Each structure stands twice: as C-alpha cells, then as structure tokens.
Amino acid sequence: MKDLEFAIQDVIGETKNTDLERVVKQNFNGETNEVGIYLALARLAQRQGYPEIAGVLKTIAWEEAEHASVFAELNGMIQEDIFENIKQM
C-alpha cells in the first residue's frame, strides 16, 4: 500500500488563521507530549537494563517528533528563512 501523506505538508503556514488551525495545534501538542513520554520510557528502560527496548522507544519518539514538525510547519510556527528561525531560538 502506498504511503499516505498530507498534500500540503511542505507549505509553511498553510493552516494558520484557518478553521484547521486549532485541530492542527491539538495534534502538535499531542505529538510533542508523546515524544516526552516515549523518551521518559526509554530512560526508564535503559536504567532497568533494557537497552534494546530503550532504542526502540527512542526511535518511536523520533517518529512522533517528525509528525509534530509537520504540524508546526502547517500552523506557521516557523518562518521560511532558516536563519530567522535560528535567531529566534
């Protein structure tokens, strides 16, 4: 089955000031929350002697962060200019 993706995922700010902005923000918040939980679980697994499980959980966390980044772009949480974004960090 072909991978599905947002048709507008590479357009920064596409959902900003639209009816979708709130839903996209909720998805961003959910994904970033999941990143924290997965990384916390990875730390716990590492401390308890399960490095392989920790590695899997870190991979899942990275995938959730990737999802969050799409939502951040859609809602215009970053600008088109990479250097302006870096200055604001």
Language-model region placement:
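Non-heme di-metal
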Residues: 1-89
